[in-house]
From Swiss-Prot:
<dbReference type="Pfam" id="PF01210">
    <property type="entry name" value="NAD_Gly3P_dh_N"/>
</dbReference>
<dbReference type="InterPro" id="IPR008927">
    <property type="entry name" value="6-PGluconate_DH-like_C_sf"/>
</dbReference>
<comment type="similarity">
    <text>Belongs to the NAD-dependent glycerol-3-phosphate dehydrogenase family.</text>
</comment>
<feature type="binding site">
    <location>
        <position position="161"/>
    </location>
    <ligand>
        <name>NAD(+)</name>
    </ligand>
</feature>
<feature type="binding site">
    <location>
        <position position="348"/>
    </location>
    <ligand>
        <name>NAD(+)</name>
    </ligand>
</feature>
<dbReference type="GO" id="GO:0141152">
    <property type="term" value="F:glycerol-3-phosphate dehydrogenase (NAD+) activity"/>
</dbReference>
<dbReference type="InterPro" id="IPR017751">
    <property type="entry name" value="G3P_DH_NAD-dep_euk"/>
</dbReference>
<dbReference type="GO" id="GO:0005634">
    <property type="term" value="C:nucleus"/>
</dbReference>
<dbReference type="GO" id="GO:0046168">
    <property type="term" value="P:glycerol-3-phosphate catabolic process"/>
</dbReference>
<dbReference type="GO" id="GO:0042803">
    <property type="term" value="F:protein homodimerization activity"/>
</dbReference>
<feature type="binding site">
    <location>
        <position position="161"/>
    </location>
    <ligand>
        <name>substrate</name>
    </ligand>
</feature>
<dbReference type="InterPro" id="IPR013328">
    <property type="entry name" value="6PGD_dom2"/>
</dbReference>
<feature type="binding site">
    <location>
        <begin position="50"/>
        <end position="55"/>
    </location>
    <ligand>
        <name>NAD(+)</name>
    </ligand>
</feature>
<feature type="binding site">
    <location>
        <position position="138"/>
    </location>
    <ligand>
        <name>NAD(+)</name>
    </ligand>
</feature>
<dbReference type="GO" id="GO:0005975">
    <property type="term" value="P:carbohydrate metabolic process"/>
</dbReference>
<dbReference type="InterPro" id="IPR036291">
    <property type="entry name" value="NAD(P)-bd_dom_sf"/>
</dbReference>
<dbReference type="GO" id="GO:0005829">
    <property type="term" value="C:cytosol"/>
</dbReference>
């Protein structure tokens, strides 16, 4: 190992140790059970914006909890659906009649209090909590349509994975929602493959929410206790923290790493290569967070479901791995592979690697993130996948 590489390793270890030592982690398992929450004078109305497989799955989780906790929530949960025809019939009609999203989450029975709504503005009418769960490239348009239809009392949770890159630089999607709509927005992310959660196989997730300065008081506003009551299920265990930046960064960048894992898997290089990609990827995720979002906590990447656990799960399967593997085996482009495999849904790593590249190029720092840059070059500039190890090694040497 070179002296510079050893120095970087020691520096990373020092950052991790200091972060864990100095952070107050007493909050980690402090949330009480939902039975300790007092009945609210005005129960919260919840709307889910998005109806893909993850959007529908989260809507199912939330609707189960609103029905079970009428002292906290209005039972009815609206789910905004981008209307489309299935065998000549509106998807919203099918969902509301059959209580099943036959296109994006087939064979999963949905709660009867979950109502599909094709009208975005109507779906958020009277809502106190918005849950955004759409492909992140559509967020600006959705937010633009919601302006003047969402009051300042509303709170939000983003389940989106990605960044907004613009005049303000690289921005968390939760921050984008806050800036554009004037409402406090947290995030949900974790080792959660939608089909497994929908089938009620046990898993964990992380919800991050920072209590705003205009907090109206317990029982009158959204806090950590209420969020746990909204999302926690016997099969879906929730930990609520404040590190919105940390879980958002991990949730976005893991998809880029997963593309790299899909490439080496498709090339038949085996588990050693996949482990190497994940090792480099985790380091770059942490480095990106510390460099551009210093408020993020290093311990989040190691201790939370939204961190290394999500990275492992995503790199073991999921959309991004499938698309990248298909690219490696067929020679097709990322967009063609996505179209063939995903039934109208998105592999978010394809867009995220471009956003990250554009930001790093602006900062003249692409060499600091060799895996992210290599994935971008393979996806957008048709660089041969077999060059991946050399690209990582070459850029690591430049960074030294």
């Amino acid at each position: 190992m070179s002296n510079s590489a050893a120095g970087r390793l020691n520096q990373t270890s020092h950052i991790l140790n200091e972060s864990i030592k100095n952070d107050d982690i007493s909050l980690r398992r402090s949330q009480p059970s939902t039975t300790s929450l007092q009945a609210l004078e005005h129960p919260f109305k919840v709307t889910v914006i998005g109806s893909g497989n993850w959007g529908t799955t989260i809507a199912k989780v939330v609707a189960e909890n609103t029905a079970l906790n009428p002292h906290l929530f209005v039972s009815r949960v609206d789910m905004w659906v981008f209307e489309e025809k299935i065998d000549g019939k509106n998807l919203t009609e099918i969902i509301n009649e059959q209580h099943e999203n036959v296109k994006y989450l087939p064979d999963i029975k949905l709660p009867e209090n979950l109502v599909a709504n094709p009208n975005l503005i109507d779906s958020v009418k009277g809502a106190d909590i918005l849950i955004f769960n759409i492909p992140h490239q559509f967020l600006p348009r959705i937010v633009s349509n919601l302006k003047n239809h969402v009051g300042p009392h509303v709170r939000a949770i983003s389940c989106l994975k990605g960044f907004e890159v613009g005049k303000k630089g690289v921005q968390l999607l939760s921050s984008y929602v806050t800036d554009e709509l004037g409402i406090q927005c947290g995030a949900l992310s974790g080792a959660n493959l939608a089909p497994e959660v929908a089938k009620e196989h046990w898993s964990e997730t992380t919800v991050a929410y920072h209590i705003p300065k205009d907090f109206r008081g317990e029982g009158k506003d959204v806090d950590h206790k209420l969020l746990k009551a909204l999302f926690h299920r016997p099969y879906f265990h929730v930990n609520v923290i404040e590190d919105v930046a940390g879980i958002s960064i991990a949730g976005a960048l893991k998809n880029v790493v997963a593309l790299g894992c899909g490439f080496v898997e498709g090339l038949g290089w085996g588990n050693n290569a996949a482990a190497a990609i994940q090792r480099v990827g985790l380091g770059e995720i942490i480095k990106f967070g510390q460099m551009f979002f210093p408020e993020s906590r290093v311990q989040t990447y190691y201790q939370e479901s939204a961190g290394v656990a999500d990275l492992i799960t995503t790199c073991s399967g999921g959309r991004n791995v499938r698309v990248a593997k298909h690219m490696a085996k067929t020679g097709k482009s990322a967009l063609d592979a996505e179209k063939e495999l995903l039934n109208g849904q998105s592999a978010q790593g394809i867009i995220t690697c471009k956003e990250v590249h554009e930001w790093l190029e602006t900062c003249e720092m692409t060499h600091e993130f060799p895996l992210f840059e290599a994935v971008y070059q393979i996806v957008y500039n048709n660089v041969p996948m077999k060059n991946l190890p050399d690209m990582i090694e070459e850029l690591e040497c430049i960074a030294d």
